[in-house]
């Protein structure tokens, strides 16, 4: 997979997460508007691309979209207690994951233009 295909797959995955859980987890979605990030970046390794974020309250989030078959293809992780105790097994996003997705979506055009320029 080249970088453009990885970005397209990642875009589809984060859109799917938001559409699937936006109404179901509405309170978490609304609370995500208050989350602020200390650092946030995207790593485009061909086999294991991911988006990473760390909030001001030091919780760490990671959205992974793997391209090889012997591991879980898509995975979300957060270090907050709400996600670890209630949502981890179901792979349901917490407010921090929703905030990370929203941050990624706001930078999507810039990322696409950067990839096209390479």
Stretches with model-predicted labels:
Residues 1-118:
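Long, low-complexity, compositionally biased intrinsically disordered regions
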